[in-house]
Each structure stands twice: as C-alpha cells, then as structure tokens.
Amino acid sequence: MLKRSTVLMWLFCMGLIVGLATNGLAQWGGKEVDTEKTAVNFAKEVERGGYKIVSTEELKGWIDQKKDMLIVDTMPYEDSYKKQHVPGAVQFEFPKEEVAKLDDKTKAAFEKLLGPNKDRLIVIYCGFTKCGRSHNGAMWAVKLGYKNVYRYPGGIKAWAEADYPVEKVK
C-alpha cells in the first residue's frame, strides 16, 4: 500500500502536469495565428513603405540623447494626442487604412510639417502595432523624398506601458 505522502506527491505532480498542459493549450489555442497575422502584415507594410523601424527603447534613448529629430503622432487630436503623446511629438492625423493618394492640400500640409531637410530624422507613430496610421505617415514621408524615416510601431500604448513620460495638451 502506498504511503499517504507518496499519494499526495503523485496527485500534486498530476495536478501540475494538467495545469501546465492546460495553460500551454490556452496560450497556444489560436493566439499564435493572430500574432503571425499581425507580424506578416507589419512586415509587408514596412516593405511597401520603404521606411525603417525603431523600438520603444531605442526611441527613448534618442530622446534622452536629445537627438535632433521630428516625432509625429498620427492619432486623432481630441481622442488621443490631446490626452497623451510622446514628449516633443507634433500631431498630424492619418487614416487607419492605407492611403494610396493624398489630396494636394494634405500633401502640402504634411510636407510643410516635415520641413525642407529631406535628410532629417523623422519618427512616426500611432496607437499600437496593428494601427495603420503610422504606416501611412511613414510611407508618405518616404514618398515625399525624406530619407531618414522611422516608424515606431508600438506607439503610445507601448510607450505608456514602458512607464515612460507622456505629455498632454492643456
């Protein structure tokens, strides 16, 4: 007959195995397909857009180094930019869906915001990785001839989650 401690140990081990298996299945259950879809879509946007990417940590480092750059928030003013944005960012809203053509007025306003120096470091972001606004902004900066364009895919969500400071419009 098995000792009580041996039975309890076996029950504990079986519970642990079932728990780990269940947790693994819960993490695996279809979520990776969503992650893959986001990653593939992002990679294709970067390829089509012709821009580079920058991580949250890299952007924070550039800001801390006081690197000369223009940071553009492409989110709506009232719903997002006014409430929180990366320090020093200026706002220029782009739609979520890819924009094949900009009207002349929007194109001129965006080019004016970006300035005459086509070699200037420009970082463009939106709310989060799946948001297409930053893709549109970065893609159009490249189409307008700017050569040092970065998309910050994590956007304000990643910035805030990293506990980095944000600015608000008063």
Predicted regions: what they are:
Residues 43-50, 94-100, 125-129:
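Second-shell loop/turn segments in exported
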Residues 163-170:
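Active-site neighborhoods of enzymes that stabilize oxyanions during catalysis
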Residues 63-67, 78, 93, 114, ...:
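Sec/Tat-exported extracytoplasmic proteins
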Residues 105-153, 157-159:
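Catalytic cysteine-centered active loop of the rhodanese-like fold, especially the PTP/DSP P-loop
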Residues 6-71, 75-83, 170:
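Flexible, polar/low-complexity N-terminal or interdomain linker segments that lie immediately upstream
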Residues 74-105, 121:
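Mid-length scaffold segments of soluble, non-membrane domains
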Residues 1-4:
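N-terminal secretory signal peptides that target proteins for export/translocation
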